[in-house]
């Protein structure tokens, strides 16, 4: 059995899909379906069982055996960069991850988990998986950074696989439940389909991010499970592309619309990553050599998926 925490969420459900595509269906999805809309991410997928996150955590903390576990993909977390409840964030992202890590270490179960490029904070260069480059801007980034630091202490002595992925700007299918935290491509598509002008912040040609397609993210996760490699790795494309490029690809697909530029909100000033670009040196050195989709390629594929029923 493979366990995917956050399996009804964005990246988790895409990992479930990638496993299904390999013929794997003996999957336990762990999630919190308080937001019932997330079920749509699983409705076309095949899993063996579902468990609520709180029930799962109780079983993990009591040391209860959950059966023959081949691996755990830990994607479950509060991923809102605008959530400032530090206690909630540390319980949800840090303590929960530690409990799960130790459960896996005691049983030598491969543990593959979601970290984040938010660990780098407001850098504009050198996105390198090393302490001197890490300075998160928000409590979400801090919770991810602190767990990475915890893992670094354990890695040298670990007898089983531990691998963390610093996800950069992931976009693609199954993110609709994320609301305001969904990707720019998702929001632009929604605005166009609603007959509205698609909106970008002023200066969006200068805001550049490493936009990585979720299908590529899932592929890297599965490759690492097969390779058995451990460590903390950036997971982006290694290319920074502008929000304008995302908009251009969206408009090109729809063959209509023009961008309306809106003022940059004061509340995001100083707390906004204006530039991200993954350094893929460690990922490539680990042996992952497949190419990553460009924004033009990924957004086009995503638009076809979003508009498949129209």
From Swiss-Prot:
Pathway: Nucleotide-sugar biosynthesis; ADP-L-glycero-beta-D-manno-heptose biosynthesis; ADP-L-glycero-beta-D-manno-heptose from D-glycero-beta-D-manno-heptose 7-phosphate: step 4/4. GO terms for biological process: ADP-L-glycero-beta-D-manno-heptose biosynthetic process; carbohydrate metabolic process. Pfam families: Epimerase. InterPro entries: Epimerase_deHydtase (IPR001509), Heptose_epim (IPR011912), NAD(P)-bd_dom_sf (IPR036291). Its cofactor is NADP(+). It is an enzyme of class 5 (isomerase). It comes from the Bacteria. Binds 1 NADP(+) per subunit. Catalyzes the interconversion between ADP-D-glycero-beta-D-manno-heptose and ADP-L-glycero-beta-D-manno-heptose via an epimerization at carbon 6 of the heptose. Belongs to the NAD(P)-dependent epimerase/dehydratase family. HldD subfamily. This is ADP-L-glycero-D-manno-heptose-6-epimerase. It comes from Salmonella newport (strain SL254). The lineage of its organism: Bacteria, Pseudomonadati, Pseudomonadota, Gammaproteobacteria, Enterobacterales. The gene is hldD.
């Amino acid at each position: 059995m493979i366990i995917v925490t956050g399996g009804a969420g964005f990246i988790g459900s895409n990992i479930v899909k990638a496993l299904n595509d390999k013929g794997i269906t003996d999957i336990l999805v762990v999630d919190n379906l308080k937001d019932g809309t997330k079920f749509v991410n699983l409705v076309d997928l095949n899993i063996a069982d579902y468990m609520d996150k709180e029930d799962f955590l109780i079983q993990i903390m009591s040391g209860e055996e959950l059966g023959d576990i081949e691996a755990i993909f830990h994607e479950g977390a509060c991923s809102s960069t605008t959530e400032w409840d530090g206690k909630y964030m540390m319980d949800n992202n840090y303590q929960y991850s530690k409990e799960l890590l130790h459960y896996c270490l005691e049983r030598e179960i491969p543990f593959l988990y979601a970290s984040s490029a938010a660990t780098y904070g407001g850098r504009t260069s050198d996105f390198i998986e090393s302490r001197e480059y890490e300075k998160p801007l928000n409590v979400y980034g801090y919770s991810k950074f602190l767990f990475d630091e915890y893992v670094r202490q354990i890695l040298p002595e670990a007898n089983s696989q531990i691998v963390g992925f610093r996800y950069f700007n992931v976009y693609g299918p199954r993110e609709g439940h994320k609301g305001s935290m969904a990707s720019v491509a998702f929001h632009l598509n929604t605005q166009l389909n609603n007959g509205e002008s698609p909106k970008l912040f002023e200066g969006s040609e200068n805001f550049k991010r490493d936009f990585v397609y979720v299908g590529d993210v899932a592929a890297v996760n599965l490759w690492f499970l097969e390779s058995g490699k451990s460590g903390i790795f950036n997971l982006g494309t290694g290319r920074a592309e502008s929000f304008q490029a995302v908009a251009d690809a969206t408009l090109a697909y729809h063959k209509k619309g023009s961008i309306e530029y809106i003022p940059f909100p004061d509340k995001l000033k100083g707390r906004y990553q204006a530039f991200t670009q993954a350094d893929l040196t460690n990922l490539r050195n680990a042996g992952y050599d497949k190419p990553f989709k460009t924004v033009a390629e990924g957004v086009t594929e995503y638009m076809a998926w979003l508009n498949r029923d129209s």
